[in-house]
């Protein structure tokens, strides 16, 4: 039963991500990378970013506390606590609302210091509309958490699908009639999100209460528990803010170009790399819980080996076909900045491997109940990213921001591995470096073959890229087989034995 639920939610999430990608395609098709898209992206990010600095830590602590309260005191107590939290967050939202509404220009300069003239005027108008989102997004976050406690996963997972369809329609209406409909659509989507969740909330018999107690012990406890999440979330938002404000100074449409390139990058990470980590992580957590250090050491090395095997060939193929990928995905309608987006994508793809490794190692630290080390590592990464952003954007423009992000991820991933090795002496990553060399050689051979064959193809269509990729992956797999990687050989041997056993 649980496997069916997980599979169903996985399918819904995949469809949601695909419709989200279509939403980005619609925006690029109708408005390209322009002052309008820059203004829209900044205006809609301001409410979320400011709230994330304050409220996301509270929301992350909500589910365990509310779940515990429901088990101990029943549904009414959990509903009442949810209402008190909502009322508390509404107060925070109202303060944020008035600050943004009356100091719009000053706040925009924090988010996009390079905005001037028409783009600034447009962003001010958009922001005054988009700020209303904050109230509805709070409700969506809390209600989604409450429904998850009551095992109502499907509608929460499916919310993104109709929301993205509304965004696509909104982009068309804004293009056809007036671009002010872009931020208006964002507000409509947030209102729709709340309405969408009302039906499952009725099924669990949730009733909203206006009562609020600032001295509530559980609220105070939740605030205390939310501090690590708040710090981590704040660091992430600062990193995001720095990238965008520097991009706003480099070129008109720069924020949009980086947004489109990073969306492509995140799509690959989400569809191909994150599932690998999701599959590997439960076994890691089990080894840590049972204190099987030798088994854990071996499994971490194996997990990183699998990540290397998946990430490196994807990285090199994305580098080879970056321009073709951008052309196929975005190269239509009003979108003209193919070269700039392709260069940004090339630099972002360098981070495929460090993103995956870092995500895995962070989860290892969390399993050891160590939340401090990843937060310190994130803080260090932000400092590195800011320094590299300022330096590289001067010399290579917009691409420098993408490169700075990737380099900071490489550095933080490497330092996190070293920290893990020092903290837990039984760990050694010498085996991983040997695997890396073998996978890198296999990937290099694959790359040479693809580049050689690419010379003989005049126009690269989707079909020709697919064929070259398949040929490249076959070469890569054969080469990798002859590299004699222990865990891979063991895996193949076990599969052969199990196949013989079923006959």
PLM-predicted stretches and their roles:
Residues 106-129, 319-351:
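Interfacial segments at transmembrane-helix termini and the short loops linking adjacent helices
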Residues 2, 198-234, 291-294, 422-437:
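Interhelical loop/hinge segments that connect adjacent transmembrane helices in multipass membrane
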Residues 451-503:
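Membrane-proximal transmembrane or re-entrant/amphipathic helices at the cytosolic face
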Residues 5-28, 32, 189, 193, ...:
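Transmembrane helical elements of multi-pass membrane transporters/channels
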Residues 56-72, 273-292, 297-304, 362:
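Helix-loop junctions and terminal segments of transmembrane helices
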Residues 3-6, 41, 75-91, 95, ...:
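Interfacial transmembrane-helix starts/ends
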Residues 154, 161-195, 372, 379-414, ...:
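Membrane-interface helix-loop junctions in multi-pass transport and translocation proteins
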Residues 135-158, 350-380, 391, 395:
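Membrane-interface junctions at transmembrane-helix termini in multi-pass inner-membrane proteins
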């Amino acid at each position: 039963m649980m496997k069916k639920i997980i599979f169903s939610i996985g399918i819904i999430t995949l469809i949601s991500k695909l419709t989200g990608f279509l939403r980005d395609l619609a925006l690029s098709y109708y408005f390209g990378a322009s002052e309008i898209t820059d203004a829209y992206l900044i205006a809609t990010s301001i409410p979320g970013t400011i709230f994330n600095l304050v409220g996301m830590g509270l929301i992350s602590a909500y589910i365990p506390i509310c779940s515990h309260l429901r088990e101990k005191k029943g549904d009414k107590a959990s509903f009442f606590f949810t209402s008190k939290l909502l009322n508390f967050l509404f107060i925070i939202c109202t303060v944020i609302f008035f600050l943004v509404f009356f100091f719009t220009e000053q706040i925009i300069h924090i988010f996009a210091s390079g905005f001037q003239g028409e783009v600034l005027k447009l962003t001010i108008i958009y922001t005054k509309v988009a700020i209303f989102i904050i109230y509805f997004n709070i409700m969506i976050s809390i209600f989604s958490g409450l429904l998850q406690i009551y095992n109502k996963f499907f509608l929460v997972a499916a919310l993104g699908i109709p929301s993205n369809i509304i965004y696509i329609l909104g982009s068309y209406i804004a293009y056809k009639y007036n671009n002010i409909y872009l931020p208006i659509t964002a507000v409509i989507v947030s209102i729709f999100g709340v309405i969408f969740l009302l039906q499952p909330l009725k099924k669990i018999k949730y009733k909203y209460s206006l009562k609020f107690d600032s001295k509530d012990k559980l609220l105070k406890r939740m605030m205390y528990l939310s501090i690590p999440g708040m710090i981590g979330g704040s660091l992430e938002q600062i990193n995001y803010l720095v990238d965008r404000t520097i991009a706003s100074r480099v070129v008109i449409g720069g924020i949009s170009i980086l947004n489109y390139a990073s969306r492509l990058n995140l799509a690959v990470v989400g569809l191909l790399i994150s599932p690998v980590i999701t599959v590997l992580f439960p076994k890691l957590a089990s080894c840590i819980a049972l204190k099987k250090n030798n088994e854990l050491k071996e499994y971490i090395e194996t997990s990183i080996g699998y990540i290397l095997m998946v990430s490196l060939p994807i990285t090199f193929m994305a580098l080879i076909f970056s321009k073709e990928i951008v052309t196929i995905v975005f190269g239509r309608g009003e979108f003209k900045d193919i070269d700039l987006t392709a260069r940004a994508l090339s630099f972002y793809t360098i981070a495929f491997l460090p993103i995956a490794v870092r995500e895995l190692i962070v989860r290892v630290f969390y399993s050891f109940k160590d939340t401090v080390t990843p937060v310190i590592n994130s803080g260090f990464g932000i400092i590195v990213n800011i320094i590299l952003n300022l330096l590289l954007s001067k010399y290579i423009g917009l691409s420098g921001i993408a490169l700075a992000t990737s380099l900071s991820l490489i550095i933080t991933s490497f330092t996190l591995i070293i920290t893990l090795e020092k903290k837990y002496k039984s760990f050694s990553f010498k085996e991983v470096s040997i695997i890396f060399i073998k996978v890198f050689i296999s990937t290099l051979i694959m790359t040479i073959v693809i580049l050689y064959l690419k010379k003989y193809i005049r126009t690269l269509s989707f079909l020709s890229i697919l064929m070259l990729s398949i040929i490249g992956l076959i070469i890569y797999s054969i080469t990798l087989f002859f590299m004699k990687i222990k865990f891979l050989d063991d895996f193949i041997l076990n599969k052969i034995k199990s196949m013989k056993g079923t006959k």
